[in-house]
Amino acid sequence: KRGHDVVLCDKNEELGGLMKLASVPIAKQDLAKVTQYMVRKLEEAGVEIRLNCEVNKNMLQNEFADYEVVMSNGASPVVIQPFTTFKHWATADDILGGKAFPGRRIVVIGGGSVGCETADYLAPLVYDRLPRDRKVTVIEMAPEVMSTESGPGRSLLVQRMMKKGIELICNAKVEKVEENKIYYSINGETHCISDADTLIFAVGYRPDKALADTLNELKITYHTIGDANSVGTIQDAIHAGYDLAKEL
């Protein structure tokens, strides 16, 4: 709108990033409309969109040598490496994105919004006529799940989880993971889960710094917004993009 020649590159086959995954959990499908709206506005503004396009050193040195660079490549889910010894593990993103498939005895490490929404998504439906015989357990270090969230959305989700029989273990810390066992402690007392067949990580995200390293190596000045700068909410990312666009 301000007259710039804008090229938007995304390494994925469609735009949206984590918004696509955020719209998968129960009662959050409407988030997909946000992405649809923004894509429509991009097209109306004449932005050149390149999908399946991961920006590399050669592109930065040649094709985009005279461009202002804005890095908004998001964040990656944190994986606790010592716990990957479990026989079958995945991140919540893997599950919601259909890249991994859980068994019937699932343990989710992390009781934040992502962990709880994933557990809710995987648990048997309330009043399901054909129960999937799936047991879901959430282990959270804080005194309660989704402790940083508030409002009716949190209350409804927690109520739904309890109705579905999801086991919520709070004030707990996973201490050790073996191929077939998960050990956690509460107030110094150790407990063991030995019947789980799937371990899911929902312990937050870490900004993806790979492109930043390349830009720094080439001594290219750039701007960082969204989760690539600091992991936050959808609103945070949208506002950051808008605020930066006003300055360029």
Briefly describe each language-model feature range.
Residues 1-15, 51-62, 72-149, 185-248:
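Rossmann-like dinucleotide/flavin-binding elements
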Residues 17-67, 147-172, 180:
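N-terminal Rossmann-like dinucleotide/flavin-binding domain of flavoprotein oxidoreductases
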